[in-house]
Amino acid sequence: MKRSWIQKSFVCMMVFMMAMGVVQKPANAQGDLDVNAKAAILVEASTGKILYEKNSDTAQGIASMTKMMTEYLLLEAVEEGKVKWDQKYTVPTNVSKMSHNTSLSNVSLREEGTYTIKDLYESMAIYSANASAMAIAETIAGSEANFAKLMNKKAEELGLENYKFVNSSGLNNKDLAPYVDQVVGGAEEENVMSAKDTATLAYRLLNDYPEVLETSSIAKKMFAEGTEDQFNMPNWNWMLPGLIREYEGMDGLKTGTTDFAGACFTGTAERDGMRFITVVMNVDVSAGENSYDARFNETRKMLDYAFANYSIEEVLPANYQVKGQKTLPVEKGKEKEVQIKTDSPLSMVIKNGEKDQYKPEFVLDKKKLNDEGELTAPIKKGEKVGYVTLKSSEKNDLGYLTDKGTNASKSSVVAVESVEKANWFVLSMRAVGGFFGDIWNSITSTVKGWF
């Protein structure tokens, strides 16, 4: 009986210790978050720092998230003066017919009616109007086919890797075919991008054209208000303030749904100066849940996790000197070494409580060094000689969306003072001293060898 009690106590103690071990195990970003979608990604918006990813490099259907690329190309065309917001568009027969297809998301456009590019843009960004996307594509490139070429070219310029665009709206080609002379690609093909590429597009859209949020944040608007064509446009992003799945700080960006792509959503929200970008693609729908709720529920999960766990913190101050590398040797200078320091503070997106996991790493500019690892005078005060970056002890660091983010995680290392080149006499004396020093060292070594 006593032995049985001891055995039971031992087992209970072991279970308790194992449980404590599980509780005390350091948190892992990938392990903390489980998104129910075929692909997903979570990114900090100012740096492009990837905080979570799931199957993010595989191309998937994107449906109407396509319209972010159409928006980018339109905003670029406006910036370059090729298109004006108050420019009038006269609706041709094919676009008018498409706009009256009630099985697609649309606002009705009268044949031969005129609408401003701003009207068409807002109907596309807010209500995901497909005919409006086609109208914008024809305005910019002359045809859907030409616009698809521009989309793919821009994708390459933006550094996207796993994508293919066949139309401006994100529709399946079978739905587009009745309204164009010829579809691009297969008869039932759709646009595809990876979750990482979709996040990169959103990142570039937000950073290159932040005014996109002025429209994507509109919860409801009347199209062509005051005319016979006026139409109430509720935003398909139900997480906007005032809508049924509202989320604090939500102000964009684009939903998407087709049979091929499933329910998708690229979201962005900002609180207290911190902005995040989320992408969910082909979300899993639980019993009793509809696909609209599912994509917003998974997005909410990601954003709650991000706002609760991450912040931007200064890790290194300006004028920081790397321990053990406060100076560099200088060849042919009046001084034989020069002090170095960082020229700016270094901040990073860091998970709460993990600041100590990041250690500075000094990287010299090899082009500045001779074969002996020395700088060569003259050296100017403030001259860049390398950079400091931060390395995490965690092996699962996911990196950044773009090189811009990677570069933002570095601080230049510069010379603290100028070092002038020594005159010919000093250099000659050093050379002579070095010559006799070498002879003396040689003699010393030889003599030592006798004993």
PLM features: what roles do these ranges have?
Residues 186-192, 197-451:
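Domain-terminus/edge residues, biased toward the C-terminal soluble/receptor-binding domains
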Residues 4-5, 64, 295:
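Short alpha-helical segments used as structural interaction elements across diverse proteins
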Residues 17, 35-36, 58-59, 100, ...:
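Generic detector of short alpha-helix boundary/capping microenvironments
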Residues 2-29, 432, 439, 443:
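Sec-dependent N-terminal signal peptides of Gram-positive bacterial secreted proteins and lipoproteins
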Residues 19-20, 79, 302, 310:
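Hydrophobic alpha-helical membrane context
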Residues 21, 25-196, 206-209:
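Active-site-adjacent loops and short helices of periplasmic peptidoglycan-processing enzymes
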